[in-house]
Amino acid sequence: MISFLLLIFLIQLAIYIVNTIGASTVDDLLWILYLRLPSSISKDARKHGELKRDVVQLKREMNATSSQDEFAKWAKLRRRHDKAMEEYEAMNRSMGSRKTSFQYSVKIARWLTLNGPRLFIQFYYTKTPVFDLPPGWFPYPVEWILSFPRAPLGTVSIQVWSSACATAISLTGNVVIAALQKSGQASMRQAQAIPAGKSE
């Protein structure tokens, strides 16, 4: 079985990755993938896209037609455009409500898969130590804090280990992001450098 050390670290890493990427980005990606599945909603999504293209095409044709010189053609295009626009708006409302309910379901599933196991482990194994501290290395107050809230004295509790993992992952992520940004800025400066032969 996987150790508590690694399990809690992986849970905190998954939470950090989802929070860094952004929950809305993950939701949008899952929505796109969901629309690719063979289902009735994917058919509706294709119809929604076709209606949008039809509305745009009719609007272009209507704008290209003079309402004064070719009134009959323009009026016919206008009626077709209005009908297509009405269908598109109804389909857009329907797709919007479906997307909202899908995102709500994804939000619940994300919370249950990320925070649910973390909370379950922290409450169910609250008296179980993650690892033992070497005897005599730390004074009593430090041992008490590290075993907080209910782990045996002289051990590290799951809550403390979870907090330590979250902090370490967050700090490491910030360092990596800062290093990537700095290297990106340096490469941009090199690309924008003025050639030696030119003067300002």
UniProtKB/Swiss-Prot annotation:
One of its GO terms (molecular function) is protein-membrane adaptor activity. The chain crosses the membrane at residues 5-24, 111-131, 156-172. Keywords: Coiled coil, Endoplasmic reticulum, Membrane, Transmembrane, Transmembrane helix, Transport. Residues 25-110, 173-200 are cytoplasmic. GO terms for biological process: tail-anchored membrane protein insertion into ER membrane. Residues 1-4, 132-155 are lumenal. Residues 45-97 form a coiled coil. GO terms for cellular component: endoplasmic reticulum membrane; GET complex. It is a multi-pass membrane protein. Its main location: endoplasmic reticulum. Pfam families: CHD5. InterPro entries: Get1 (IPR028945), Get1_fungi (IPR027538), Helix_hairpin_bin_sf (IPR029012). It is found in: Endoplasmic reticulum membrane. The keyword Transmembrane helix applies. HAMAP family: Get1. Belongs to the WRB/GET1 family. Interacts with get3. Required for the post-translational delivery of tail-anchored (TA) proteins to the endoplasmic reticulum. Acts as a membrane receptor for soluble get3, which recognizes and selectively binds the transmembrane domain of TA proteins in the cytosol. This is Protein get1. It comes from Talaromyces stipitatus (strain ATCC 10500 / CBS 375.48 / QM 6759 / NRRL 1006). The lineage of its organism: Eukaryota, Fungi, Dikarya, Ascomycota, Pezizomycotina. The gene is get1.
